């Protein structure tokens, strides 16, 4: 089974940042991406377990994968649906 986090188009490390900074950085990064590109988000803020999936739903992006069982958390977002 392949690692869904292995080859993202971009990576954003938000470790050490607290809500709302991680989501603000994700939004800024995604704005400059092309539809279909992927972004690996690395975070350690517990609020991201709620905020990143919510951002994807609200902004109509795809949350391809998430790993939130241990720190750092990882989220793979694909721009667009």
UniProtKB/Swiss-Prot annotation:
Q: Which UniProt keywords apply?
A: Cytoplasm, tRNA processing
Question: What protein name does the entry list?
Answer: Sulfur carrier protein TusA
Quaternary structure, from the entry: Interacts with IscS.
Q: Which PANTHER family match?
A: SULFUR CARRIER PROTEIN TUSA, SULFUR CARRIER PROTEIN YEDF-RELATED
Name a single GO biological process: tRNA wobble position uridine thiolation
**Origin organism lineage:** Bacteria, Pseudomonadati, Pseudomonadota, Gammaproteobacteria, Enterobacterales
Role summary: Sulfur carrier protein involved in sulfur trafficking in the cell. Part of a sulfur-relay system required for 2-thiolation during synthesis of 2-thiouridine of the modified wobble base 5-methylaminomethyl-2-thiouridine (mnm(5)s(2)U) in tRNA. Interacts with IscS and stimulates its cysteine desulfurase activity. Accepts an activated sulfur from IscS, which is then transferred to TusD, and thus determines the direction of sulfur flow from IscS to 2-thiouridine formation. Also appears to be involved in sulfur transfer for the biosynthesis of molybdopterin.
Q: Which CDD domains match?
A: SirA
Name the family the entry cites: Belongs to the sulfur carrier protein TusA family.
Q: In which pathway does it act?
A: tRNA modification
Question: Where is it localised?
Answer: Cytoplasm
Molecular-function GO terms, alphabetical: sulfur carrier activity
Q: Which GO terms describe its cellular component?
A: cytoplasm
Q: Please name the gene that encodes this protein.
A: tusA
Question: In terms of one coarse class, where is the protein primarily found?
Answer: cytoplasm
Q: Which InterPro entries does this entry report, sorted A to Z?
A: Sulphur_carrier_TusA (IPR022931), TusA-like (IPR001455), TusA-like_sf (IPR036868)
Active-site positions, per UniProt?
A: 19
Q: Name one Pfam family in it.
A: TusA
